Curated annotation (Swiss-Prot):
Residues 150-152, 307-308 are annotated as: Interaction with tRNA. Coiled coil: none annotated. It comes from Neisseria meningitidis serogroup C / serotype 2a (strain ATCC 700532 / DSM 15464 / FAM18). Its EC number is 2.8.1.13. This is tRNA-specific 2-thiouridylase MnmA. Its main location: cytoplasm.
Amino acid sequence: MNTTANPSNIIVGLSGGVDSSVTAALLKQQGYQVRGVFMQNWEDDDNDEYCSIKQDSFDAIAVADIIGIDIDIVNFAAQYKDKVFAYFLQEYSAGRTPNPDVLCNAEIKFKCFLDYAVGQGADTIATGHYARKEVRNGVHYLLKGLDRNKDQSYFLYRLKPFQLERAIFPLGGLEKPEVRRLAAEFNLPTAAKKDSTGICFIGERPFREFLQKYLPTDNGKMVTPEGKTVGEHVGLMFYTLGQRKGLGIGGAGEPWFVAAKDLTKNELIVVQGHDHPLLYTRSLVMNDLSFTLPERPKAGRYTCKTRYRMADAPCELRYLDEETAELVFDEPQWAVTPGQSAVLYDGDICLGGGIIQTTDKPVIITR
């Protein structure tokens, strides 16, 4: 297990899922003083048919009961709306595609929850993330999880050194099938529960239906780069770069993909073929930089992920100023999307990254 220096009092973030359930059970088995916290980060739609928050809380309470630990339900909904959801709406309004899970980790799970846990006398917090942590010469390093299919270091890149020092990830050295097996051995009610998908506050409801409640929509044309109209979109915010499904463009030839958004004309620019040149980029500019180590990495050679679960892409890091950097890739990268995160790695070490603003292709047009 990846720990700080002999933590004894640990508070586990119990989400009602199998991963956090096994995390708590393992720590209790290993002799630590363990308590659970269920974080209620969304509350507007508690009676919505798609909302699973209540069931998740019931599952978390049931798990705590079986393990034999206390659990508190703590409401961070106000902080979530202020720090995460407002940003989510702002980015979609600007034509970008944000990743609220990244911000939720930095602002809620490893800030609000961490502050709460420390206030309760905890030495450390634990979560069910598939990531690892190693301490070398007093420095806490965030590493990829051993299960490459589940590695979640991408979503943790905004953690600061002080947050990493107080966090442990007991599942980092395990693979998902083993976690399921352990859940069954511990007789946990979440052993067969399916993994959650999508953004936590949206749940299983259709994304378009949810977003329309908060942002105005405006239909417009789908056009080719040459300006030919080939269809109609239902609102630019509902589409992301590289999207293929849901375009509704008929006719012969290769599938159509979203290549860019023209916010001035309210047009969605689409191209035919996965390998169309407009879908590939050789460089990007990112800002709002955040790093996991006390000193930011030097300019130079690293690998990068511009979306979750993609293969590491070799690149060159160049700083433009204190808050902005450029990444130049060895090979063109597909559908690099403003609003998403570019995360840097040195081998297995997650160094940090930033928010993608622009690429060498005009993908968000505001002229």
